[in-house]
């Protein structure tokens, strides 16, 4: 994308917003079924919702937005649906990457790339390379991602270091393992949102979600918009985050 304009670098100061929001974008198929439409149309409308939420995240002062784009378990879906999802990813990167770059969005990809089609890998690499110096909003795309697989891969890296004599196993702790995950430089999510009313993480950021606030909203992903995001943030703001401890009492 050599014709992309120079990106913006700073976002608004909104101290009330969570720094990192992660979203499980669920309900595209059910949204389509409720309207008598093919599942592919639900996924297409889901991409439109993603555009809205990326824009809203910047406007609300969110610094990191992680989206669960394609789970490692999604390979069990019909081949035609997988083809539709990959086609949407191709079009999204080709059509939206220049505008994301212009708006100062940095794209990061987490997940397993081995086994993906070569053109998909090339597009993912292009998105990261073009936007690597942007700082207004970091969009983390979890693609072909599974949290258990991510943790297992981190354990394998540590095991190799021990086997090669580069690490004493006694030095391995939670911080060490966390540093071997896919994106250790990105802070853990403050808020995880799941659409469609389902109340589970589905193998998404299970390590990073240790102290995240979880908000489950009943609407399907294609209907999610800035107002819905603001509602989830308002619920987040009402929570008392304890991080395993007690909330300090104010003096009366």
UniProtKB/Swiss-Prot annotation:
Biological role: Catalyzes the condensation of isopentenyl diphosphate (IPP) with allylic pyrophosphates generating different type of terpenoids.
Cofactor note: Binds 2 magnesium ions per subunit.
InterPro entries reported in the protein's UniProt record: UPP_synth-like, UPP_synth-like_CS, UPP_synth-like_sf
Protein's name in the database: Isoprenyl transferase 2
Coiled-coil annotated spans: none
Keyword line: Magnesium, Metal-binding, Transferase
Cofactor: Mg(2+)
Keyword Magnesium: yes
Catalytic residues, chain numbering: 26, 74 (proton acceptor)
Chain sites annotated for binding substrate: 27-31, 39, 43, 71-73, 75, 77, 194, 200-202
This enzyme's EC code(s): 2.5.1.-
Family annotation (NCBIfam families): PRK14834.1, uppS
Organism, scientific name: Bradyrhizobium diazoefficiens (strain JCM 10833 / BCRC 13528 / IAM 13628 / NBRC 14792 / USDA 110)
GO biological process terms held by the UniProt record: polyprenol biosynthetic process
Subunit structure: Homodimer.
Keyword Oxidoreductase: no
CDD domains with a match to the protein in the record: Cis_IPPS
Similarity annotation: Belongs to the UPP synthase family.
Gene Ontology CC terms: cytosol
Binding positions (Mg(2+)): 26, 213
The protein's enzyme class: transferase
